[in-house]
Amino acid sequence: AQSVILATGAFERPLVFANNDLPRIMLASSVSAYINRYAVTPGEKLVVCTNNDNAYKTAFDWKSLINDQVTIIDTRRAVQSQVVERAKAMRIKIIHGHGIIEAKGRTRVKSVLVAPLCMSGKEIIGEATEIYCDVVATSGGWSAAVHLSSQTGVKPVWNNEILSFQPGQAVQSQKSVGACNGSFELKECIEDGISVGASEAKRLGFESGKPKQKIDLSENKSEHPTQELFCLPHFKSLSRAPKQFVDQQLDVTAGSIELAAREGFESVEHVKRYTALGFGTDQGKLSNVNGMAILANALGKSIAETGTTMFRPAYTPTTFGAIAGREVKELFDPKRYTPMHDWHLENTVEFENVGQWKRPWYFPKAGETMEQSV
């Protein structure tokens, strides 16, 4: 291809807090997907915990569908934006300057402990209160999906304004647009895609370079900045608090990342191998940024200084069937032969598959069964 445009989107980040692996603790976007795609809610009482404006949309979706109990826990103080005003108009309870420090329950979440936080959100400054709920929606911001651009040789660069890695300088004829380039608003994504697509079409001699039509989108744009908060504090230290899962696929906790730093594993690549952070089939799509932030904090560095690991193919797990094709028959698994294989064939052998090796099983004469031959 003369030009490739990547529009791979972004992943919503979960917030890290104690017991955050209980069933019905979900991403805010996942709760919205249940509501908007299937018209169902995963529970009756919702608590939304967020450090950004975007998660308010989940509360709006919930309220619009069942008009039931919703509480928004916003880690930011004095938030001024349209989504806050809309939430107040819908009589949604908002608790600013607080965060979930621990979830309670055995087989599923039944309540959360909520405590007031300092301006940075990294310290608790008061007593915790318990809020009963059966669904928790969390949002810690968005991470640009830089995986495919990384596989072209582009090194991800940390952008502190959007609190995400985004593609650096391209080394091939490739451009990233929309959310994977750090534009997380829907309108910005579409405008970016149209603009870059038209520009590349003109450069390659196909079109005039001007968009054929404009798309008018009315949406609640995020107005208040996302707070730089990845791991919510607890009354106890990371090593003593209930488990705060960062990579839920491989059970990597905030405490294990901090322990890795204490043990002297300062390189992000070493920490990845010490803890298995991002080693799962998702290649750290939800966990890497949170993990890098916790590591940076433990080392007293910035996320930009800590950096991130690169991403290997494939972007998503690939089935054996897609690789092998339709007519596999005996080609699915390679056959391995011993030096005496031809002699065995000359002596009417029946083979036994031992791994990939063809081993002689027994040597029947004409018409003999295995029992008769043996």
Kindly give the residue locations of the regions a language model identified.
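Residues forming the flavin
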Residues: A1-P339
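N- or domain-start disorder-to-order transition segments that initiate the globular core
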Residues: D333-V374
